[in-house]
Regions:
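Sequence/structural signature of outer-membrane beta-barrel proteins
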Residues: 2-3, 33, 51, 87-91, ...
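Residue-level detector of alpha-helical recognition elements and their boundaries
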Residues: 29, 41, 82-84, 97, ...
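Outer membrane beta-barrel
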Residues: 1-90, 117-122, 126-134
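Glycine-rich loops and low-complexity Gly/Arg-rich segments
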Residues: 19, 49-53, 93-96, 108-110, ...
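Transmembrane beta-barrel outer-membrane domains
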Residues: 4-9, 58-62, 114-118, 153-160, ...
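Outer-membrane beta-barrel translocator domains and adjoining extracellular loop/strand segments
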Residues: 4-11, 38-43, 92-100, 146-156, ...
Length: 193
């Protein structure tokens, strides 16, 4: 600890159980996108490094401050999550944070000193009705955050749609995910920064 200046907390939230199928959550939580961000411990993916999509597009470990609901609908075999989060930070102290070579990774706020100029919406549905199969559909929509909202070009729009599937049968395990990320207002942002 002699050279440590900060300590990061991965998750810290309160969860209130409304009933058997619904919870309200608030605090520092993982953004529900894809497979690896929610299940990111090294023993849960095959390889030394995280997949490229989970390093730059879904910048695991991606956690933000938020509030929302989670639960399940047993008769439909669905698990759901819906949250309002602070978004990626794109501009602070008079300079841009995001660069194309890093994807969205450097914009993660991780809870510490987070700026919220407009909340972002994130949700995920998981279907678990077939033994061994889990299929997920996730979405993330909003704008990046800035510490100076008077500079209009300091934010960009972020829209992500994700589809993931996992299947396990005996010793066979198959996984796949597809993430479509769209950024808007990038030309104005690049001109500014």
């Amino acid at each position: 600890y002699e050279h440590v200046q900060e300590v990061y907390v991965e998750q810290a939230y309160l969860k209130y159980k409304l009933n058997e199928n619904a919870n309200v959550l608030a605090g520092l939580m993982l953004v529900p996108m894809g497979i690896i961000n929610e299940y990111h411990e090294p023993t849960t993916f095959y390889g030394v490094e995280r997949p490229n999509v989970d390093a730059a597009i879904v910048p695991t470990t991606w956690r933000e401050l938020g509030v929302g609901i989670s639960g399940k609908i047993d008769n439909a075999s669905l698990k759901y999550q819906a949250y309002l989060f602070n978004g990626f930070k794109s501009y602070a102290g008079g300079s841009g944070i995001l660069r194309g070579s890093d994807g969205l990774r450097k914009g993660r706020q991780k809870g510490a000193e987070s700026v919220v100029s407009s909340p972002n919406f994130s949700s995920k549905l998981d279907y678990y009705g077939i033994p061994g199969l889990r299929v997920g559909l996730s979405g993330y929509f909003g704008k990046t955050q800035t510490d100076d909202s008077s500079i209009e070009a300091s934010t960009i729009g972020v829209a992500m749609i994700g589809f993931d599937a996992r299947y396990k049968y005996n010793n066979l395990e198959l996984r796949g995910q597809y993430i479509n990320a769209n950024l808007s207002d990038t030309e104005d942002y690049n001109t500014l920064t």
